[in-house]
């Protein structure tokens, strides 16, 4: 991580600590700070920021209540990791790297990678596509690690696990999340 990214991380960590003290009062102030920080360029997510701002400012909005409940009821460390990984890594740091690599390689770089660690499942849901492929298809820990490492080099920090039932591989997934905590 370069100096600029380290400074962004420190700023976001401070901002998160600030909002956590009183989410209802501090969320609009934080959003104003994010607007200044993001700027007005094409990669500044203006549509997404407007949607977040609308939810934060409209106290009668159901999403506002949901967000505030999540902020108040979720373990602070879990909330901080989610905030840092989603907003900072996957968007503020990741998006410019993705844009750079799109131009460099002349192809799309996804914002998120959908990863199926296993086709195994213990749920037997009606109509599930995974059942059609059997339950013996598995990515190794090293293969999952390689996919995530390569993705991060391209600016991808968001991974969505599907399957099968991903938690059949619970130990591996926890280990991979610990290894790639960003």
Regions found by a protein language model. Give the residues of each.
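Auxiliary Fe-S-binding modules of radical SAM enzymes
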Residues: 1-66
């Amino acid at each position: 991580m370069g100096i600029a990214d380290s400074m962004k991380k420190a700023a976001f960590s401070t901002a998160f600590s600030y909002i956590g003290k009183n989410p209802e009062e501090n969320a609009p102030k934080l959003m104003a700070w994010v607007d200044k920080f993001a700027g007005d360029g094409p990669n500044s997510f203006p549509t997404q920021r407007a949607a977040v701002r609308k939810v934060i400012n409209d106290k009668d909005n159901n999403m506002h209540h949901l967000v505030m409940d999540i902020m108040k009821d979720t373990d602070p460390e879990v909330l901080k990791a989610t905030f840092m990984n989603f907003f900072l890594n996957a968007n503020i740091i990741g998006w410019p790297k993705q844009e750079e690599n799109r131009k460099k390689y002349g192809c799309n770089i996804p914002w998120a990678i959908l990863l199926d660690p296993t086709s195994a499942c213990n749920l037997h849901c009606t109509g599930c596509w995974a059942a059609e492929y059997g339950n013996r298809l598995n990515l190794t820990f090293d293969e999952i690690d390689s996919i995530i490492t390569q993705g991060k080099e391209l600016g991808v920090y968001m991974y969505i696990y599907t399957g099968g039932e991903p938690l059949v591989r619970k130990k591996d997934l926890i280990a991979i999340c610990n290894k790639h905590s960003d």
